[in-house]
């Protein structure tokens, strides 16, 4: 992607200082999603590495990963798989617990969401420490998916999340980077 487009995408993301707590700068993609041109460019860029290849499913992490992942799945003519917080899916599920900054959480997926060997791309809006994305990768692998890559609009490289996924042999594609957390 050319530098002007990357700069335009970065400019389309609102930064909110001291949210949700002092010292944190929240990267709000709702402004990017609300700009039709920026949204289109972001989805096109997320799709680009996989155009012409076989991607069976795109998995999106609740909640912003649903928006981006659904659009990516549509463009790739792939199915979409939601990865949700525990208790939100109506059918038989498989779940995984993962660590948060203060405590733990659980996410789940329908047990029949992918077929063994399905090639899956994981999509979310942002990667920080990588704990949620790592849990999603492990959950997908647990039900037989081949996770071919993980894609994010935003990377906070100082927090090490992309490196954490690469250590699991998952290629990571991100569009823009922001310093700090």
From Swiss-Prot:
It comes from the Bacteria. One of its GO terms (biological process) is adenine salvage. One of its GO terms (molecular function) is adenine binding. It is found in: Cytoplasm. Transmembrane segments: none annotated. InterPro entries: Ade_phspho_trans, PRibTrfase_dom, PRTase-like, UPRTase/APRTase. Pfam families: Pribosyltran. SUPFAM superfamilies: PRTase-like. It is an enzyme of class 2 (transferase). Homodimer. Catalyzes a salvage reaction resulting in the formation of AMP, that is energically less costly than de novo synthesis. Belongs to the purine/pyrimidine phosphoribosyltransferase family. This is Adenine phosphoribosyltransferase. It comes from Methylobacterium sp. (strain 4-46). The lineage of its organism: Bacteria, Pseudomonadati, Pseudomonadota, Alphaproteobacteria, Hyphomicrobiales.
